Amino acid sequence: MSTTTTTTTTEKPIQVTLYDSNTIKQTLDDSIVKYVTSALSYTQNQKLNYTKVLFGLIGCTLAAIAQFYPIPFPKNKPVLILCVALYVVISLILYYINIFIQKDYILQASKSNDEIKVATVLQKYDPNYQVKIENAKNSSINVPFSKSIDLYFDTKGTFLESNFHNDLSVQFKKFAKLNVKDK
């Protein structure tokens, strides 16, 4: 006679400090990424993030060259000027990427031929968490929705992830219907 025991791993509920909008937004954003990559089996596209890291590495290298260049100060002015100028250019490129390309997008993901972007906004002192799911190739196909964060956190600050994932499921089904109509 054999006995089979199943062990279930229960995740510790996520606690946040109520009225800390940054922590609340980060918790909700992380949950969206978890839902899209786990439940919907999308693969997260990190190309833009890797590009930003590469530019940051180049900027740090320029700063190190400017600091540790072997020739003393008065003679190394052209090198310092070049390093500072290139650092400014790299900073402007990173700023451009953040403001005009990445915008409020927290996730870019793909599955077979389907590519999506998810943007979120939680304004300070506003209880409504806004999510926009859109097709990465055709931004006119999008599903925006806004819900109060009170639905996803109890009075002690415990994150009610299943409630949030249920709402996400409904929105992603709407998005899938719109996406199929367009194809």
Curated annotation (Swiss-Prot):
Asked whether the UniProt record includes Iron among its keywords, one would answer: no
- The transmembrane residues are 53-73, 81-101
Indicate how the chain sits in the lipid bilayer: Multi-pass membrane protein
Fetch the Pfam families from UniProt. Answer: SPC25
Q: Please, which domain of life does this record's source organism belong to?
A: Eukaryota
What job does the chain carry out? Component of the signal peptidase complex (SPC) which catalyzes the cleavage of N-terminal signal sequences from nascent proteins as they are translocated into the lumen of the endoplasmic reticulum. Enhances the enzymatic activity of SPC and facilitates the interactions between different components of the translocation site.
What is the recorded name of this protein? Answer: Signal peptidase complex subunit 2
Q: Which species is the source of this protein?
A: Dictyostelium discoideum
